[in-house]
Each structure stands twice: as C-alpha cells, then as structure tokens.
Amino acid sequence: MSDTEYDVIVAGYGPVGETCANLLGYYGIKALILDKEKETFPLPRAITWDAECQRAMAHCNFLTEVKTRKIRGVDNKDAKKRSILKITMDGFDTYNYQHSILFIHQPQFDQVHRENAKKYQTNTIRTGNEILSVDQSDGVVNCSYKNIETGEEFKTNSKYLLACDGAN
C-alpha cells in the first residue's frame, strides 16, 4: 500500500464517528474526521447505552464525564394511557460495569466525546466540511471535501474510510 496523508478518514461526527475518533486517537492512528455540521445536534436521538458501549468507551478514559442514569423499565402506553407493553430490567447481568442499559442525554454525550477526541494529536477534526467525492484505487481512498463557510476545496487520501454519517 502506498503512503497516504491519513490512515483513516471518518465521514460523520455523530456518536459513531465520535467513538471512532476517540478509539483511533487512543491507538495513535492518524485520522481525519469530517462532518458537514459545525456543532452537535441539540436534541437527543440515541438515548441508551449498554455494556458493550461502556466497554468501548472505557478505552477513551472519559466515562466519568458522561452523565447516565439507570433504566428500571419501560412502560409503553396507548393514546388513552393504558399500558400496552411493559418491560422490567430486573435480573439483567451487569458484566462488571455499572448496569446493562443506561439512559444518556445525547447532546451532552456528544460534547464529552468531542472534547476528549481533541486531545489526541493524531486526530485532525474538521467540522463544517462536506465530502464532495470519494473514490478508491490501488488501495488508496481519495477524498475531496469543502469548507462550507468559505467554499475552499481540499483533496486528501487515506488507507481506509469509515462511513459514520448515520441518517444524514
């Protein structure tokens, strides 16, 4: 494989892209993180966190910064407020972590993720930048993107591309 500017380009900087940025930074992998939005979305979408998420985050050393609360159960109600599906979380294994399922407030979770990802010198984070094109040849990913504010266009390359752009 030929030399590239980055090892990985991360397309999207929501919860999955933020997690990738933190893990790539933790392992010293040179990454370019791109997202068309400058700021995090202010409303929650992802709201739960299980033991698998917690294991991944343990590597990033910021678990104490994330505010979580335990889920005791769920009671889904119809329009007349009658219970139609009730689930209790009693008896779920905790896998030596806090609890198997926790509630999170995603905007706060995103902010903690992003602040932590900045500390890794191998991360280049460019929010407010939109990917224009991606192609791959001879084991190299070529990417062009532009700064949405200035319109300035850039070209770069990497060994890998992680598509973390979610619903966008």
Q: Predicted regions span which residues?
A:
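Glycine-rich FAD pyrophosphate-binding loop
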Residues: G25-R45
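A conserved short coil-to-beta-strand element within the FAD-binding core of flavoproteins
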Residues: T127-V141
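Core beta-strand elements of the Rossmann-like FAD/NAD(P) dinucleotide-binding domain
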Residues: T4-Y6, T150-Y160
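Active-site-adjacent segment of FAD-dependent monooxygenases/related oxidoreductases
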Residues: L43-N116
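Short beta-strand segments that buttress and anchor functional surface loops
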Residues: C143-K146
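Beta1/beta-strand and adjacent pyrophosphate-binding region of the FAD-binding site
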Residues: S2-V16
